[in-house]
Regions:
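Acidic glycine-/aspartate-rich tracts in secreted/extracellular proteins
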Residues: 18-20, 27-28, 79-85, 98, ...
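Glycine-rich, low-complexity segments
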Residues: 19-58, 155-157
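Noncatalytic modules at the cell exterior or secretory-pathway interfaces
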Residues: 121-138
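Short hydrophobic/aromatic-rich beta-strand motifs
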Residues: 1-24
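Short, surface-exposed secondary-structure edge patches
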Residues: 2-7, 63, 67-69, 121-122
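C-terminal interaction-tip segments
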Residues: 41-42, 137-157
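Beta-rich globular "head" domains
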Residues: 58-95, 145-151
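Terminal beta-strand-rich extracellular "head" domains
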Residues: 82-123
Length: 157
């Protein structure tokens, strides 16, 4: 049977419906926390996943965004619907001003992947959408599933 008791600071659980770990700080559960300190400071590993339908043009900006204050470890993606377009040879994945930060010359076929590990973790100070940029031509359509892998810092209370 089950035995129930009050959690102690530093106690860890797995939250099934969120598919993530949580740590008890003594006053609240911190979802995704890798570590927490007395006073509420914590570091959490987070992941945001979303699908993106590619619109016609040379650049396709996602609704999925890197959160404000995120320290990004990398961005991964998989082509879920063939990416098509006249003259298209591949695509880049990045953000405005760093169009290939997470990958370039990425395949167009269903199942093509990008594992865009950030060479040095990058901090973002505003919500920042991802950008797909066409190489060799322009997008006419297609779809990708994207995942943003990042750290989130929680200051002490």
């Amino acid at each position: 049977g089950w035995c129930f008791g009050a959690p102690k600071p530093g106690g860890r659980v797995w939250v099934i419906d969120r598919d993530a770990p949580a740590i008890w700080t003594g006053s609240t559960w911190l979802l995704g926390a890798m570590g927490a300190a007395p006073g509420g400071a914590a570091t959490a590993a987070k992941l945001i996943v979303g699908d993106h339908q590619i619109a016609a043009g040379t650049v396709s900006t996602t609704a999925l965004a890197i959160p404000d204050r995120a320290v990004v470890i990398g961005v991964t993606a998989r082509v879920s619907e063939e990416i098509v377009g006249a003259g298209l040879t591949g695509w880049r994945l990045g953000v405005a001003g760093a169009e290939d930060r997470y990958g370039s010359s990425i395949g167009l076929a269903v199942g093509s992947i990008v594992n865009g590990v950030t060479g040095t973790p990058v901090a973002y100070y505003a919500d920042t959408p991802l950008q797909l940029e066409a190489q060799g031509g322009a997008f006419a359509g297609g779809a990708v599933r994207l995942a943003i892998h990042f750290l989130e810092l929680t200051p002490p209370v």
